[in-house]
Amino acid sequence: TSSATVLADDPALTVRWQELSADTQALYPEENLRQPLRVVIDSQNRVTPEHRIVQQAGETLFARLRADARQWPESARTLLVPEHNGHLDLVLLMMLLGKQQINSVWVEAGATLAGALLQAGLVDELIVYIAPKLLGNAARGLCALPGLEELSQAPHFKFNEIRQVGPDVCLHLTTA
């Protein structure tokens, strides 16, 4: 996720066993639950040790342009990643994560990070939830993709699965 998401939502980004269905709980006993490594892209060092993401069980990795002088718990690590075109180098970040045997990355992010990952060619699968609600043209879009104005420029995906989840629809897409 990005620091913008952490600042806006203060998410935990944890697996909450008690919120899983009874069938899923039966498959995965609570004592076997493993929390994911949370990776936060925080190029301006805006996230603090007081945010919920840092206070959860499991490890949090901060991808940053420079070190942060604050006192952090042992569960928080920093990975320094150089800048590319004015932003943290996302391609290099993924390569560095791969060197740590992190080969699958789930991203929960807003339009800016989602768009940057798409533009960098780092997305091979999308899971998109769509609510049966419409917003106007001034609302924030799913992905910030500046300069993409014609269908011929659009990234191509194929549908793997379409299912209803409560009142919403879940689209599972992979690159075409």
Regions found by a protein language model. Give the residues of each.
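Short, flexible micro-motifs
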Residues: 5, 45, 112-115, 139-144, ...
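Structured beta->alpha junctions
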Residues: 82-85, 132, 163
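Short, loop-centered acidic/histidine patches that primarily coordinate divalent metals
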Residues: 110, 129-132, 165
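A generic "binding-loop/recognition-motif" signal
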Residues: 110-113, 122
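Flexible, gly/pro- and Lys/Arg-enriched active-site loops
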Residues: 119-157
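Active-site ligand-binding patch in enzyme domains
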Residues: 1-103, 112-115
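Conserved histidine-centered catalytic loops in small-molecule metabolism enzymes
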Residues: 146-176
